[in-house]
């Protein structure tokens, strides 16, 4: 199945945890015929929350992709976790998305995290639709939620729907752009006349939409000033321009759980969100010309694709999610990995529907899919034509903010623990694992308690090893508060040539871990011995004189000394520097402090 870019929409589904993102994805998949029945998060039966951890926690933890067909258009849904600890998943998914669908509850307030995720999409230039969910609940407050959004995004917000409420619940909706009303039925929705009591609201919303449309196009703006109105087609055209330029954010409403308003949403995604061949601001470096170029989504051009996520399964191996930005990725082809600077053999190409993979012959420009068992490819890598080498910018992930020590419950399984955690670090670039040489501990870092808890459980599930978490031991450093000078003289006489090295060194506090400099005049210490002095000092940094901790924040300046034409050697000056270090730091008001992380 190869579909061209004009018939593809790549939509990241975003929002805070618990707002109904996965349920909305499930409803869209059901309406598109991708599933026979609409699964539920609470039952663990949804397409995009397929991992055992997600099923047990009743929340999205990993990025998942699933496609559906709607009106001859392929919609690739990218379901992103909403919890803060999994922010890295958002960075991955939005790299592949052409637009975003923000899901928020109809609670009359701006939800936690909504502002940051909207702002992030706007910075990336990702067109956005807002879906106010939960309109089946009693006292659902659509207009209160719209007002809360307008307080932050007044100049961009464009509500296009009016809910038809009965007994506090949404029973239908009016599309002000299309000037049509619908009542929800068991099979979807049926068109009805616009209720008389809502006609004034419809007219007011239409007037606002005309004004918004006019602001997105100079020709429309001139006509609007002259006549005070626009045709329906002109209004729709102006709104679409505004969405594409992220100047306009349309707002819709419904109930994902009850599958109400979802068909209207699918229609608007096809009508208003960018076609995959419309996004022309994708930049990459042309490696031959050494310049930044704009990658046009031309299916006939040489291949340019990027891996945006990696999943490693202990049984089936590595699965690389990718988006084709240009050309076509074909099963059985050989491509160039611009990051690893090596060829990569492509086996079978797949499209994704949750955990299910469907084999295809190729992915055309604008499409999203996956390839398994790539040898040298990691998240963020560029795959391209070997005769047209380009490289996309790396995906920038937040650095770990919480660090814990981890150990095996059973003695002798530490290597198994480290290997399992290292595999997870290949999947999640916000997670780090290292062995601390000073404390002997395995240290892991992540975005928060929830992420670390999930990763530990995942290692147990995948690799059958139990672990325990503890606070990391503190690795201390020694540093100095004052300036001091010292000399070191290494003199040794044996039967033949002796050993002689003599140096005078000034030690000062500094902001860098270590700086070596020299101020020797008159050749008191020949230049060929400067590296030996520096090496002797660097080797001495490993163990300070106060408590044996590594020394940091030290500047050492070699300013004088002496040498012997016959007996001096690099070894002698290295030893002399070590003696000066030991003597000098005794007089520098040493103190210890916890080791800062890079």
Residues covered by each model-derived region:
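Structural and coupling elements of P-loop NTPases
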Residues: 1-593
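A short, hydrophobic C-terminal helix/tail in secreted or cell-surface proteins
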Residues: 594-598
